[in-house]
Amino acid sequence: VAQFKIECIESNTDTDRSQYGKFVLEPLDRGQGTTVGNALRRVLLSNLEGTAVTAVRIAGVNHEFATIPGVREDVLEILLNLKEIVLNSYSNQRQIGRLLVQGPATVTAGHFDLPSEVEVVDKNQYIATLSPGSTLEMEFQVEKGTGYRAIDRGGGGGFVKSITPLKMQG
């Protein structure tokens, strides 16, 4: 039976808070690397803890393909930008955040009105651009979870049907 050796040969955290690590596990027989890699990926994805915006309600919007007068991005682009927001939550309970911005403005995650249990990691994360006289108003759910969870179109946690569910970030 071979003695396996694992070694971290490179590790860093980028300015956008993404982390990178390169490890060597040896010696492995032919085909064992793929088997070990797949098992490791599954374990990591199912056990990583994360916080994300999981549902959104935007004032005056009834579907994700709509546009908002005076806002450069359409609703789908705004939703994709919201999915990129990196959040930390100190509560296991669902939290509600709000956003109300008058144009002209460049809307960022720093404009969010969040409960004290939730914080934005990068307050400069871009959401949308508003022209003069326009308004962007929304309410969104923030949830903490483990692993990856796909869209659940059935439930909005008490939100009305105009809510747009998002996939949870891991």
Enumerate the language-model features and the residues they cover.
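Protein-protein interaction/assembly regions in multi-subunit complexes
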Residues: 1-170
